[in-house]
Each structure stands twice: as structure tokens, then as C-alpha cells.
């Protein structure tokens, strides 16, 4: 139970099923699950359409590695997503969770510059950033009580002001990029959840 505060916790609630926004324990008590920002809960529990489609796919193919192979569900999803992106951003990498996606994004950005013969290895993020619990994800975010035990193992990233003052944030970002060693700017689009639900204007992006 890694997300339980053991100093104050009582007995863990035994959850046996979920339905929509509700979690049901072994005595039939219902609890509203308000943690929809964590992982895969945002569509609700036991969502019939999702369950049906997952079942149908598992009857055909559960997984194949994208190393000389492909499959139509992934291709179809990429085609749908690409319609919403600029043509120079129509690239996709599927990951099992957010932290892993961040790790891969950091590695890809460094490799991109290495392939171009440029040594750009520094990352820029917004003040208050949270990108996950793996070492790279923690390194690319704001330091906190949760990352403190691992501080000696984390690489340094540069934090620029949260764009409450849009022009100040953009000016700071331009200053850092001009130094010539920035591999990537990683940011939470529109809202920082872990930092207290801080939001900024879509136009800033």
C-alpha cells in the first residue's frame, strides 16, 4: 500500500468492485472515488463500452511489439489523433503509464540532439511541475518531500516561472533556450494538478 500514510492510517478498506464514480467495499458500502486524475480512473469504473472493446480486442490480439510489426488498432488511433496535430508533430509513442512516457520523451529528446551532433542535455520545466515518480520524471519536476530521499540521484533541471505572468514565463523560457544546451521543455498543458490545480491560458501554449 505505497500511497497510504502508515503513521495515521487505519485498516485499509477492502474494495471488491467499482461502478462509475463509486467504489464498493466487502460490506456493500459505497464510496465516491474522487481520485480520477490518477492513472485510468477518469472514465469511471467498469465502464461498459471500454470493457466490451477490451474484451473484443483480447480475443484477437493482446500485444505485439512495434519492432517490425504493426496492427490496425494502433494505426487507426494514430490516424485519428494526427488530424488534431500540426503535420510536424504527427508522431506517436504509446506507453503504459505517465512516468514511463516522460522517461521515454526525455530520452528521445536527448537522442534527437545526439543524432544531430549537438550536446543538448538540459531540461526546462515549469515551477511546481510534477511529471511522475521515476527518476527522470522526478528530475524534470519541482523538488518536494516525496523526492527528497532521492535527491542525490536526480539530475538538475531548470524551472521557469509558472505562466500566471505569461510574458515573464515566455521571456524566461527564451533566455534558457538561447543558452544552447536545452534538450526539451516539458510542461503540463493548461493545469498543474499536484501543484494545487493551477491553471493557465490555452493561448500560452
Write out the residue ranges for each language-model feature.
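Active-site-adjacent loop/helix segments that line or gate small-molecule/cofactor pockets in enzymes
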Residues: 1-22, 36, 69
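Acidic surface patches and DE-rich sequence motifs
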Residues: 25
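Short clusters of small/polar residues that mark proteolytic maturation junctions
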Residues: 35-36, 139
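A short, flexible beta-alpha/helix-coil linker loop
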Residues: 37, 60-61, 165, 190-193
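PLP-dependent aspartate aminotransferase-fold enzymes
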Residues: 79-187
Amino acid at each position: 500500500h505505497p500511497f497510504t500514510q502508515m503513521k495515521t492510517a487505519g485498516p485499509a478498506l477492502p474494495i471488491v468492485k467499482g461502478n462509475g464514480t463509486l467504489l464498493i467495499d466487502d460490506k456493500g458500502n459505497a464510496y465516491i472515488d474522487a481520485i480520477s486524475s490518477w492513472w485510468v480512473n477518469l472514465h469511471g469504473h467498469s465502464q461498459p463500452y471500454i470493457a466490451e472493446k477490451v474484451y473484443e480486442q483480447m480475443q484477437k490480439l493482446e500485444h505485439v511489439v512495434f519492432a517490425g510489426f504493426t496492427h490496425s488498432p494502433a494505426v487507426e488511433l494514430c490516424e485519428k489523433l494526427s488530424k488534431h496535430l500540426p503535420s510536424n508533430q504527427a508522431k506517436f509513442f504509446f506507453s503504459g503509464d505517465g512516468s514511463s512516457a516522460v522517461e521515454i520523451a526525455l530520452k528521445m529528446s536527448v537522442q534527437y540532439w545526439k543524432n544531430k551532433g549537438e550536446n543538448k542535455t538540459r531540461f526546462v520545466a515549469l515551477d511546481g511541475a510534477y511529471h511522475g515518480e521515476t527518476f527522470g520524471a522526478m528530475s524534470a519536476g519541482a523538488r518536494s518531500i516525496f523526492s527528497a530521499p532521492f535527491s542525490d540521484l536526480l539530475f538538475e533541471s531548470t524551472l521557469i516561472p509558472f505562466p500566471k505572468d505569461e510574458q515573464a514565463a515566455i521571456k524566461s523560457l527564451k533566455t534558457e533556450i538561447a543558452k544552447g544546451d536545452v534538450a526539451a521543455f516539458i510542461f503540463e498543458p493548461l493545469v498543474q494538478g499536484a501543484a494545487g490545480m493551477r491553471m493557465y491560458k490555452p493561448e500560452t501554449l
